[in-house]
Amino acid sequence: MEDYNKIIESLGVKFAKARHIRILQTIKIKNVYDVENTILVLYNGEVKLAGNEEKVEPGDLLFIPGGKAATLTYGTGEPKNISYEEFMTRRESYFESMTDPSNIGQVPNSFGLIAFEAKVFDSVNFFTSLDIPPFFIKAHSKLGSLIHDILKEDCSDEAGRGRVIRNKTEEIVIEIVRHILKNRMFVEQLATNSTYFKDPRLIDIFTYIKNSLPGDLSNKQLANVANVSEDYVGQYFKMLTGINPQDYIEY
């Protein structure tokens, strides 16, 4: 468990958007895709995930990792089939965004949605790299409460609004990770795809870069930190993160 504590501590979490949505007509959207992670809580009506026959009740949640396409049905009854491109072009015909905080969770055929980034050392998309599919979370009161609070803050202009939203978005990420671990979900994927996050040499490199800007960050110095050869350090870093170390430093 200590390994996952280190991973969570390394995560850079950024809030992207919050939406309180009323479903205007029943639709089935093919290949819904977003680079950001999305968590949705159903308030009233129906949401279905293609390939998953689980019955979803009000209060249940759906998590979609960034970069994972999903076919989703919103609303009850026979849906209209549309592409994601058509949905984005005519979004206002299908969804109504609501901004009155007193209506959150009180409107028929509605849901709340939060989108966010979660990157290990601000470089690697954590949930994307785990290669896990979208999944439902049954009646998780804490996650539901966090989403409600973020939606409420997002509708306000109170002092400290941004700070509250950032803190609660970080809590959402932690609760999702805890849910996955507690329920032993995706055990094989976690064992395979989280290994490199636990590599102490990689953690040493990330920590050194973070603490040494704008000092000596040459490959030679990074190799000394990780105790690998200068010729190998670039290949090693890219193999584990998908990016060259100097590109990461510039980013």
Regions found by a protein language model. Give the residues of each.
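An amphipathic alpha-helical interaction segment
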Residues: 110-193, 197-207, 232-234
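Basic/polar phosphate-binding segments, predominantly the helix-turn-helix DNA-binding elements
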Residues: 175-181, 204, 208-251
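A short, N-terminal "cap"/entry segment at the start of jelly-roll beta-barrel domains
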Residues: 1-12, 133-138
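A short, mixed-charge helix-start or loop-turn motif at secondary-structure junctions
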Residues: 105, 154-158, 191, 219, ...
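Exposed alpha-helical structural elements
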Residues: 3-7, 17, 125, 142
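Short alpha-helical hairpin
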Residues: 13-17, 147
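N-terminal regulatory/effector-sensing and dimerization cores
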Residues: 17-127, 156-159
